[in-house]
C-alpha cells in the first residue's frame, strides 16, 4: 500500500482520485455487506464506506473476506492506513466520502475508555490525554491554534517584537499572595504571574514588544474561569496614549476573532458557534464606559426582573454577575475604564486630576464570558512610583530595575495582557475554561 498520505482536510481537492489516509477509527457502523467508518487524522473528520463485494472482486474471495472482516471488527481508536476513491455524495454530511478498497491496521486499540456514551467530567478529566481526541475537544484546540497564529500575525504587522520575559523571578508583578514559591539555589524565587515588568524594560529598548508564555497564579478558586497555570499574551508600548492603547486592544481582539473564522471554520461549525454573532463583534465598535458610569448603570437596573447581582457602591469591585450584566447590556465587548486605584496594581498611572482613579481598562466579553483583557497606562514618573510603593509597604530593593526605567529617559507607556484560554473559551463558545488548554491545572488537579 502506498504511504503517500493525504490529510483529511485536503480530501476535497482529490474528488475522483484514489488516495491513502493515515487515520484513527473514531466510530464504525453498518451490517451485512457494508461498513461505515468515521475517521479522524487530527485535521478533520471523514467517513469511509466499505463494500464486501468490492473487496472480493479486488483481492479474491479469501483475502477479500479477510480484509472486509478486519474492517467489520475494527475497534475505536485503532490506527489504520485506508485507501479508496474519493466520491461526491450529497447524502454525506461532508458532501463526499471515501469508497474504501484497501486497509492496513497500524496499531490496535482495545477497550478504549471513552466511548460514544455520556461520561462525567471527573472521568473525562482523568482521561484528558484521550479526551483530547474527541470531536469537540479537537475543535477547541484548533481554535486555540488559530488564535495563537493570529496573535503573532497581528503583532508582526503592527511593528511589535517578540520579547521573552523570564518565568522565574524574585518579585511579584501582581498580588504577592498568589505566588508559587520555589527555591533558587538557596534564594526564594517565584513562578511568573506576568511578564509585564520585564516587558516594560523591553518597551524602553525596542518601542513595541510582546511576549507569550505560561504564567502561574496560586488562586484557590474553583470557578469556570480560573486556572492556576495558563498562557498569557502581554504587550507593552512606548509613546501611546490611553485611547490609542484601547484602539490597539480592540483591533487585536477583532483580529483574533477573524483569525478563528478564517483558519478554523470547521471547528466553529463542530462547536455550533454562532459565526454571525462573532462577525457582529468584529463589525461593531466596542463600547467604552467608565467604572463610575458602570456603577451608576448597575444601581439603576438592580431591581429589574432579569437582574441577578448584588448591590454595589462606588469603590466596590465587580463580581462575575456584574461583568456579565454590563457586557450583555451593551451587546458587544465593552471596555470599563478608570477603576479605583484602591484595588488595582501599584504601577498604574492615576487619571489626571483624579488620583483615586487610574488609567486602566478591563475588556468584558458578552454572553457571560466576563473579563478577557486587563490593561493600563503605567506610572512613568519616578517620584510618584516610589511614593506609591512606600504607601503600600513594598520592598523597593526587589524593584530597582523597574524603577531605573523611570530614571533614564522615561516616557508615556502602557500595555495589556490577555489570558489566551479566556479568549479561546469566548470564541469557541464553551462554558468552562478547563477545555481551552490541553492539560488544565486547577485547584485540585495537576494530573495528567
Swiss-Prot record:
Give the family from UniProt.
Belongs to the class-II aminoacyl-tRNA synthetase family.
- Location(s) in or outside the cell: Cytoplasm
Q: Name one GO molecular function term.
A: nucleic acid binding
Enzyme's top EC category? ligase
Reaction(s) catalysed by this chain, per the record, are:
tRNA(Asn) + L-asparagine + ATP = L-asparaginyl-tRNA(Asn) + AMP + diphosphate + H(+)
Tell me yes or no: is Amino-acid biosynthesis among this UniProt entry's keywords.
no
Q: Which UniProt keywords apply?
A: Aminoacyl-tRNA synthetase, ATP-binding, Cytoplasm, Ligase, Nucleotide-binding, Protein biosynthesis
EC code: 6.1.1.22
Pfam families in UniProt:
tRNA-synt_2, tRNA_anti-codon
Q: What's an example GO cellular component term for this entry?
A: cytoplasm
Protein name (record): Asparagine--tRNA ligase
Its primary localisation, in coarse terms, equals cytoplasm
- Fill in the subunit field for this protein: Homodimer.
Extract the Gene3D superfamilies matched here.
Bira Bifunctional Protein, Domain 2, Nucleic acid-binding proteins
Q: Name one GO biological process term.
A: asparaginyl-tRNA aminoacylation
Amino acid at each position: 500500500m502506498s504511504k503517500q498520505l493525504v490529510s483529511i482536510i485536503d480530501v476535497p481537492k482529490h474528488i475522483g482520485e484514489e488516495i491513502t489516509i493515515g487515520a484513527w477509527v473514531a466510530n464504525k457502523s453498518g451490517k451485512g455487506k457494508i461498513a461505515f467508518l468515521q475517521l479522524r487524522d487530527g485535521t478533520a473528520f471523514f467517513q469511509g464506506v466499505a463494500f464486501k463485494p468490492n473487496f472480493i472482486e479486488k483481492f479474491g474471495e479469501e483475502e477479500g473476506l479477510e480484509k472486509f472482516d478486519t474492517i467489520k471488527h475494527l475497534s475505536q481508536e485503532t490506527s489504520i492506513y485506508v485507501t479508496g476513491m474519493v466520491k461526491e455524495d450529497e447524502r454525506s454530511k461532508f458532501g463526499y466520502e471515501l469508497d474504501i478498497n484497501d486497509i492496513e491496521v497500524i496499531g490496535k486499540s482495545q477497550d478504549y475508555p471513552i466511548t460514544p456514551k455520556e461520561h462525567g467530567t471527573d472521568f473525562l478529566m482523568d482521561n484528558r490525554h484521550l479526551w483530547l481526541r474527541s470531536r469537540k475537544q479537537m475543535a477547541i484546540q484548533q481554535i486555540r491554534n488559530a488564535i495563537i497564529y493570529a496573535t503573532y500575525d497581528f503583532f508582526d504587522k503592527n511593528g511589535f517584537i517578540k520579547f521573552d520575559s523570564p518565568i522565574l523571578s524574585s518579585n511579584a508583578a501582581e498580588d504577592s499572595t498568589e505566588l508559587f514559591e520555589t527555591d533558587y539555589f538557596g534564594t526564594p524565587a517565584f513562578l511568573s504571574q506576568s511578564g509585564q515588568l520585564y516587558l516594560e524594560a523591553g518597551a524602553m529598548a525596542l518601542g513595541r514588544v510582546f511576549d507569550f508564555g505560561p504564567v502561574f497564579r496560586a488562586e484557590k478558586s474553583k470557578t469556570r474561569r480560573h486556572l492556576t497555570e495558563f498562557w498569557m499574551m502581554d504587550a507593552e508600548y512606548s509613546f501611546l496614549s490611553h485611547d490609542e492603547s484601547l484602539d490597539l486592544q480592540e483591533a487585536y481582539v477583532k483580529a483574533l476573532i477573524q483569525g478563528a473564522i478564517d483558519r478554523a471554520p470547521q471547528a466553529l461549525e463542530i462547536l455550533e458557534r454562532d459565526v454571525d454573532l462573532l462577525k457582529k463583534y468584529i463589525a461593531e465598535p466596542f463600547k467604552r464606559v467608565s467604572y463610575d458610569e458602570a456603577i451608576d448603570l448597575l444601581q439603576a437596573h438592580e431591581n429589574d426582573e432579569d437582574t441577578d447581582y448584588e448591590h454595589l457602591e462606588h469603590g466596590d469591585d465587580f463580581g462575575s454577575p456584574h461583568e456579565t450584566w454590563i457586557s450583555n447590556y451593551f451587546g458587544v465587548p465593552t471596555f470599563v475604564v478608570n477603576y479605583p486605584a484602591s484595588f488595582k496594581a501599584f504601577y498604574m498611572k492615576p487619571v489626571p486630576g483624579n488620583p483615586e482613579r487610574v488609567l486602566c481598562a478591563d475588556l468584558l466579553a458578552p454572553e457571560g464570558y466576563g473579563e478577557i483583557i486587563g490593561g493600563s497606562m503605567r506610572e512613568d514618573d519616578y517620584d510618584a512610583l516610589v511614593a506609591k510603593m512606600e504607601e503600600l509597604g513594598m520592598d523597593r530593593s526587589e524593584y530597582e530595575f523597574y524603577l531605573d526605567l523611570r530614571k533614564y529617559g522615561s516616557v508615556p507607556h502602557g500595555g495589556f495582557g490577555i489570558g489566551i484560554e479566556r479568549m479561546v473559551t469566548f470564541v469557541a463558545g464553551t462554558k468552562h475554561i478547563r477545555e481551552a488548554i490541553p492539560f488544565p491545572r486547577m485547584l485540585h488537579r495537576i494530573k495528567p
